[in-house]
Design a protein with these regions (language model features):
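Iron-associated oxidoreductase/ferritin-like identity signal
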Residues: 1-106
Length: 106
């Protein structure tokens, strides 16, 4: 959560830093959704895999928006994602996805 002093506001550098943290999470999501959508196997997961492809594209749009904001602030967008957890187990992949989403919300 961003803490903003009502009188001082937030510095441009701090805002860019926080946006870069968000951008790193967007990259993480893109990579995870691309990988998970392709390696989930079985009829039970096909509709989920299709949705993950859609989410990957949405996350790319988010990453582009955040990158523009960082550039507007005169800073360089990060190129480093948060590490992506993978597994051979479909349920574990979906659990990782849920954990990532919960962490992003915090």
């Amino acid at each position: 959560m961003i803490s903003v002093d009502s009188e001082q506001g937030i510095s441009r550098d701090r805002l860019a830093e926080l946006l870069n943290e968000d951008l790193a999470r967007e990259y993480q999501s893109i990579i995870a959704y691309v990988v998970y959508s392709q390696v989930l196997k079985g009829a039970a997961y096909m509709s989920i895999a299709d949705q993950l492809e859609i989410h990957a594209k949405q996350e790319l749009d988010h990453a582009l928006t955040i990158s523009r904001q960082i550039d507007y602030l005169g800073k360089m967008p990060t190129v480093n994602p948060i590490p992506v957890k993978t597994s051979e187990d479909a349920k574990a992949m979906l659990r990782f996805d849920l954990e990532n989403e919960n962490e992003t919300i915090r």
